[in-house]
């Protein structure tokens, strides 16, 4: 009976602890990757590239006479799904700009295509940086991918509209199925938004992303996106600050602000998907006390970086993961963040890791004394009662003195000895 009661209580406790751990890691990852700053950078580049990008998409559709009649539907598809209800004025301005691109000469048209490629490349690099993929794609691989997106993407949308229209008007326009058509049309923008986020999260990262993680992230991003659309429409309708300040030019800051919100939502969803892949629920198991728990993983990371630097090279996060397979990706990020914060290592201009501290003067105890709580044995809150304060304080001093004596050796000497025994 006591055991069943204990299991009944521990399950919610473990679930709550896992949620707290996930939210804490998500918050750190969100701030470390500078999501808000990256969203602003992408919003600015998108604002400059949106007209060239739309011009390229419509020009690709104009190549085939089959899709030429669907250009209007593609326009409506994009604006109905990715602009709030108050975006009619924005739509009119954009189509005025896009219509003028048809008279651009060949060299100008090529520059529009290059600008659109740069936008897709920036999106690719920003998302992959969240997954810790610092090394860019090879030129030919990246160019082929971006070219495929720009050319086959519009054709895919056009083909989908052709097929959907055929099924719609042949099977869903009569009888009881007409009600199904009406209800489905209401959900279609949400479904399209979900599909766009899902494909973004599962295809763009140069890492294997689980289907369920991308699916969950797309659901979260879609909910945030729909909330943002309604909030933005309310803001524009009731708080007309931009119109009072900018007048007729208010469409530009409004469009920029809306694009910024889109990228905040998209990158937040990407961070959520990444965290789902690296954070695993912790099980409450009884472990033997190990006073040096956690320091071995930190020493392994330092040793790998030191060995590479001694050979004249530096390690990226990807290479470090391959060399430290016994360390989880989440723990490795925590360790590198800790070492960077303590100036034991630093990042080169290329984003690789290099040593900053002198391992001949930094001792094991120096390292152990500054290890954060999430890298060592967690304390049991039930044993922190002040009633045992004096006894525990004396015991702690004895342990510290023993550790100082036993660990008073430079890291370089310890790592050299450990390497020779391997």
From Swiss-Prot:
Main location: membrane
Topology in membrane: Multi-pass membrane protein
Disulfide bonds: none
Signal peptide from the UniProt entry: none
Keywords: Cell inner membrane, Cell membrane, Membrane, Transmembrane, Transmembrane helix
Spans through the membrane: 47-67, 103-123, 143-163, 185-205, 208-228, 247-267
Protein name: UPF0761 membrane protein Paes_1471
The organism of origin for this protein: Prosthecochloris aestuarii (strain DSM 271 / SK 413)
